[in-house]
Amino acid sequence: MKVVHTVGKRRTAIARATAKEGSGKIRINKKPLELMEPKYIKMKLMEPVILAGEALSDIDVDIDVKGGGIVSQMDATRTALGKAIVEFTGKMELKEKFLSYDRTLLVSDARRTEPHKPSKSSKGPRAKRQKSYR
């Protein structure tokens, strides 16, 4: 039985996907994709599923997501799901389709929050006193 493990990251959210032979079920934190709320997040998560089409009919994907907020978790999940579908099927045309639609379906967003600097640490990394000219 073929099993593929992939990872998607966005800020502090990490999604780990496991794809194996099955009947086309997708579960996120043991909850079916169809039951995800709010609707905006469900629709964003459906994008790789809709693009894959019939290629997804014999794949089961289980995704565990931790850290971050709702939107970061959604982006990390999309990336992990997209990578899992492409890696499991091994189809280059599917990879090209994903990349032309939205690059973040296969490539994690590398941006992270900037560390706070020592001077005004609680206020943020670039906080300065407001300058007064008179």
Swiss-Prot record:
Biased composition (Basic residues): 118-134
Keyword vocabulary terms for this entry: Ribonucleoprotein, Ribosomal protein
GO terms of molecular function: RNA binding; structural constituent of ribosome
GO cellular component, one term: cytosolic small ribosomal subunit
PROSITE patterns: RIBOSOMAL_S9
Region (Disordered): 109-134
Keyword Ribonucleoprotein annotated: yes
Pfam families in alphabetical order: Ribosomal_S9 (PF00380)
Ribonucleoprotein keyword on record: yes
UniProt record, GO biological process: maturation of SSU-rRNA from tricistronic rRNA transcript (SSU-rRNA, 5.8S rRNA, LSU-rRNA); translation
Family recorded in the similarity comment: Belongs to the universal ribosomal protein uS9 family.
Xref: NCBIfam families: PRK00474.1, uS9_arch
Protein name per the record: Small ribosomal subunit protein uS9
Originating organism: Methanococcus maripaludis (strain C5 / ATCC BAA-1333)
